């Protein structure tokens, strides 16, 4: 009788089943990693937008002379607005209108410029010529509502001059 070498059909089926199960597990890990990557990418885009907006605001505020009350601005703006006077005769206000966009308005022109869509501002001023600014943006990922916020403390360079 001849000696037969090789795998039986059952051994081949078991090996194929183990291989398919391994591929399924690896694909599950891949999908989970991909979802995590996409979530983090979207989150970082939102945070980058907030920091770019904060940089625009900081550059202007640092050149300001003094903080003002929102009631001192020529037009009606929300109470949580950031209002400050510049070295010339202008007063600048940053405010959110109906949680839809962040606007910048100068008292000399009274036309609002959109700074960032979907970004809300909240500002607290201190008597020492500084303020705490918080920017917030709501965003959605796969049907889940998320909110990101950043904060920065800014000092006026020309305070008291």
Each PLM stretch: what is its role?
Residues 68-132, 147-149:
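Type IV pilin-like appendage domain
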Residues 1-3, 147:
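N-terminal cationic leader/targeting segments used for protein routing and processing
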Residues 3, 86-87, 141:
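Acidic surface patches and DE-rich sequence motifs
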Residues 3-55:
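Aliphatic-rich helix starts adjacent to a transmembrane/signal segment
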Residues 128-161:
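Short, surface-exposed interaction loops/tails
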Residues 36, 52-73:
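Alpha-helix exit/C-cap motif
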